[in-house]
């Protein structure tokens, strides 16, 4: 048994040549030999008390023959900074320069230093870094000392509290900063030079959110400072390194020239990562099986915080439209997994970072909070954090804490939801005063192995609210009087779908915008799964065609646009909805309406060439346009002018400094009707003109373009190994292929053949998912 108290690390960097020398002291005790994780590092020597200790090296570990030992292990090693990958320690270019940065979750600290790279092996870290004098250095803790040594300097940081290896951070380069203070805590936004002007919004959000969490959790933020760092090349949205949170630039930077969507995204991601400072950093899961504990809770809490602090954004609407919706779709596939999933290998761990660990888990937490009540739920959270701070915990520890806080049998209720995969569809039929209920597991492919869940139903019958725990496959409720109206799963707090035998009783109910969203989303998925025909789905869509709520309109247009992309000659209801809703939302000034207007405009510009030609003229004044319409104008310009517009859009893309602006123009560059222009745009990724981080994000968008799918497929097949090298060590490319395969394969049998005959072990699950979705779409094409 090994116990580690502290890592004392000294790193000497050659910034220009992207190499470093490391000297590490590990304070530990062990009953036997020490096994450290180490990948890609050159181990020069291992000593104790100045004497060499024998060791052996495998591909991923060092076996150090200490025998029983209590003391300090001294390791000298050498490392390299990656130039292509986006995990471990890597180079992040910007303009004509770069920074060195790190990304260690889940198992990449071992590529930086020899360590026990396991979340349960918490330790203190004391870090010193030798760099060129003109470079800045950021880590988890404040700087304790700076000492000059020739043309270099040694920067020493304060010691961290006990924490897991994956939360360690180091950034080297040139940074600009803005600061604020909350009590004794420094809150700092850092960017590469020339970007800090867009940091103030995130700084303000962070201060409000930390204050909110300190109150909600009943525990102060534990470190002296909190850095929020915009990284110019970053694989994920953000990473919760304790005291030094990293973000891709589009997840942190926003100002008055940003769209509503951009500001909402920044607020959401900042709140998510700050929630981790308590839930993940202060208290950490024992092993990756319980990753959902970190991610579900941060997802849930970020929406809770923003819903409270920015009420005008209706963030629970955003929650169901993104988190719940994505999780319901992912969990309807046969390739899904339980929230609590057993994993051992790095590949398995990476595949857990998905809609189940984030969205489903967060949706279950929302369901449990609704069942327990706000205060009892909060009390349980506080018990959990106070019991396990600076330590590790399991899912059982979490549910037990909620039981202590509420006095209710939480573990018993949630067991089905976290240990079983999938979820039910509840069939609701009415006979006089009687409600007949039946449940079965919902599959996108139509059918499969059944399961029975404990479903905490919420109903409103004849205007009266009822709660009922459905524990059997079939059950019934008699309310004692004839039923005139009914709705089930009020405000979409439950993680299940509802099928009604008589929809007129639903439309007799008073439906909130969340209820309408749920009904519409359910029946769209019933159509995809072959449970209802298009006529039934279309009749519901027509009920909502003139609805004036942003969430309902977003969902309506999103579903109809999805069908248009499957077969634009068959599914044309979109053309009836868009003119009416674009006109209506163009007159509204509130932020949610402006966001919806932006989406409507972009969709209309892509699907309708006549509308696009009218909008394209606005490109002349692109720089002065409302940020909410810029993307639509770029798309319209590409659709209208084709090849003649390409160079102008490309030059505009190249001249923009901020990623938010570049992304808008990139969507324009992928909207051409001419396939070779879309391929030319994708090929910018090969030269670095499109950031490595963005390739996976734009591939699905490109695949939605029905005019260029065959050409895009040839490009993807040709450059598959390049893409794999960019995202090595992550599951990002796999998730991208899950979205891309269904559209590229609609009319191209080669796609299925390619992915069934070629093996990609790190993406196997998501490729199977994509093929399953493709089967579903082929039924409706």
UniProtKB/Swiss-Prot annotation:
Binding of Zn(2+), residues: 272, 276, 295
Cofactor(s) named in the record: Zn(2+)
GO CC terms: cytoplasm; extracellular space; membrane
Domain of life from the UniProt record: Archaea
Class of the enzyme per the UniProt entry, highest EC level: hydrolase
E.C. code: 3.4.11.-
InterPro entries xrefs: Aminopeptidase_N-like_N (IPR045357), Aminopeptidase_N-like_N_sf (IPR042097), ERAP1-like_C_dom (IPR024571), M1_APN-typ (IPR034016), Peptidase_M1 (IPR001930), Peptidase_M1_aminopeptidases (IPR050344), Peptidase_M1_dom (IPR014782), Peptidase_M4/M1_CTD_sf (IPR027268)
Keyword Cytoplasm: yes
Pfam families found in the cross-reference section: ERAP1_C, Peptidase_M1, Peptidase_M1_N
GO MF terms held by the record: metalloaminopeptidase activity; peptide binding; zinc ion binding
SUPFAM superfamilies: Leukotriene A4 hydrolase N-terminal domain (SSF63737), Metalloproteases ('zincins'), catalytic domain (SSF55486)
Binding site for substrate: 105, 237-241
Glycoprotein recorded as keyword: no
Assigned keywords, A-Z: Aminopeptidase, Cytoplasm, Hydrolase, Metal-binding, Metalloprotease, Protease, Zinc
Site-annotated residues for Transition state stabilizer: 358
Cofactor descriptive note: Binds 1 zinc ion per subunit.
Residues at the active site: 273
Any Gene Ontology biological process: proteolysis
Broad class of where this protein is predominantly found: cytoplasm
Record localization: Cytoplasm
PANTHER family linked to this entry: PROTEASE M1 ZINC METALLOPROTEASE, PUROMYCIN-SENSITIVE AMINOPEPTIDASE-RELATED
Family from the record: Belongs to the peptidase M1 family.
Protein name: Probable aminopeptidase 2
Taxonomy of the source species: Archaea, Thermoproteota, Thermoprotei, Sulfolobales, Sulfolobaceae
């Amino acid at each position: 048994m090994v116990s580690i108290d502290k890592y004392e690390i000294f790193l000497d960097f050659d910034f220009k040549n992207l190499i470093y020398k490391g000297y590490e002291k590990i304070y530990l005790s062990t009953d036997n030999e020490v096994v450290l994780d180490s990948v890609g590092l050159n181990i020069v020597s291992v000593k104790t008390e100045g004497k060499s200790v024998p060791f052996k090296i495998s591909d991923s570990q060092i076996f150090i023959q200490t025998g029983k030992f209590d003391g300090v292990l001294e390791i000298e090693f050498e490392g390299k900074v990656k130039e292509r990958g986006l995990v471990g320690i890597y180079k992040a270019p910007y303009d004509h320069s770069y920074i060195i940065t790190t990304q260690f979750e889940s198992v990449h600290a071992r590529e930086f230093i020899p360590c026990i790279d396991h979340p349960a092996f918490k330790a203190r870290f004391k870090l010193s870094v030798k760099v060129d004098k003109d470079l800045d250095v950021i880590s988890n803790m404040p700087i304790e000392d700076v000492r000059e040594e020739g043309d270099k300097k040694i920067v020493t940081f304060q010691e961290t509290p006990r924490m897991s290896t994956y939360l360690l951070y180091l950034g080297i380069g040139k940074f600009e900063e803005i600061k604020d203070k909350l009590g004794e805590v420094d809150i700092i936004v850092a960017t590469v030079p020339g970007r800090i002007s867009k940091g103030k919004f995130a700084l303000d959000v962070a201060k409000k959110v930390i204050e909110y969490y300190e109150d909600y959790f009943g525990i102060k933020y534990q470190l002296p400072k909190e850095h929020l760092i915009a990284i110019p090349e970053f694989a994920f949205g953000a990473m919760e390194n304790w005291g030094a949170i990293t973000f891709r630039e589009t997840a942190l930077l926003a100002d008055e020239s940003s769209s509503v969507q951009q500001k909402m995204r920044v607020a959401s991601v900042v709140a998510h990562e700050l929630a981790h400072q308590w839930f993940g950093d202060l208290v950490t899961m024992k092993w990756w099986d319980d990753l959902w504990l970190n991610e579900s809770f941060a997802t849930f809490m970020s929406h809770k915080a923003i819903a409270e602090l920015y009420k005008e954004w209706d963030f629970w609407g955003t929650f169901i439209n993104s988190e719940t919706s994505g999780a319901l779709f992912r969990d309807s596939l046969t390739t899904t997994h339980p929230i609590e999933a057993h994993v051992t290998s790095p590949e398995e761990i990476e595949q857990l970072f998905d809609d189940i660990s984030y969205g489903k888990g967060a949706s279950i937490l929302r369901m449990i909070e609704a069942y327990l009540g706000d205060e009892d739920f909060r009390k349980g959270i506080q018990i959990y954090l106070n019991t396990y701070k600076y330590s590790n915990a399991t899912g059982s520890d979490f549910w037990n804490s909620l039981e202590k806080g509420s006095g209710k049998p939480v573990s018993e209720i949630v067991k089905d939801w976290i240990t079983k995969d999938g979820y039910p569809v509840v069939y609701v039929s009415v006979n006089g005063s009687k409600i007949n209920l039946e449940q079965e597991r919902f599959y996108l492919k139509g059918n499969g192995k059944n399961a029975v869940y404990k479903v905490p139903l919420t109903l409103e019958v004849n205007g009266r609210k009822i709660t009922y725990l459905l524990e059997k496959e079939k059950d019934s409720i008699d309310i004692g009087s004839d039923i005139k109206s009914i709705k089930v799963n009020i405000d979409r707090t439950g993680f299940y779908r509802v099928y009604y035998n008589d929809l007129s009783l639903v439309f007799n109910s008073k439906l909130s915008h969340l209820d309408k969203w749920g009904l519409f989303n359910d029946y769209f998925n019933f159509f995809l799964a072959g449970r209802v025909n298009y006529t039934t789905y279309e009749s519901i869509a027509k009920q909502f065609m003139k609805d004036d709520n942003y969430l309902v309109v977003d969902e309506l247009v999103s579903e109809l646009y999805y069908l248009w992309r499957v077969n634009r000659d068959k599914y044309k209801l979109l053309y009836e909805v868009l003119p009416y809703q674009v006109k209506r939302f163009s007159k509204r000034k509130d932020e949610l309406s402006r966001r919806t207007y932006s989406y409507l405009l972009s969709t209309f510009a892509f699907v309708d060439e006549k509308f696009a030609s009218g909008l394209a003229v606005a490109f002349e004044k692109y720089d002065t346009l409302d940020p909410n319409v810029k993307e639509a104008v770029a798309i319209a310009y590409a659709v209208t002018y084709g090849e003649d517009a390409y160079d102008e859009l490309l030059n505009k893309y190249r001249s923009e400094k901020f990623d938010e602006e570049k992304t808008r123009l990139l969507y324009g560059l992928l909207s051409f009707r001419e396939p070779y222009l879309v391929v030319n745009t994708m090929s910018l990724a090969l030269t670095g003109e499109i950031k490595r981080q963005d390739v996976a994000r734009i591939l699905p968008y490109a695949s939605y373009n029905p005019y260029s799918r065959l050409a895009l497929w040839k490009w993807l097949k040709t450059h598959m190994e390049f893409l794999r090298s960019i995202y090595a060590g992550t599951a990002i490319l796999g998730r991208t292929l899950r979205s891309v395969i269904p559209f590229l394969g609609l009319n191209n049998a080669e796609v299925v053949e390619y992915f069934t005959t070629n093996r990609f072990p790190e993406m196997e699950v998501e490729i199977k998912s994509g093929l399953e979705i493709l089967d579903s779409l082929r039924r409706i094409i």
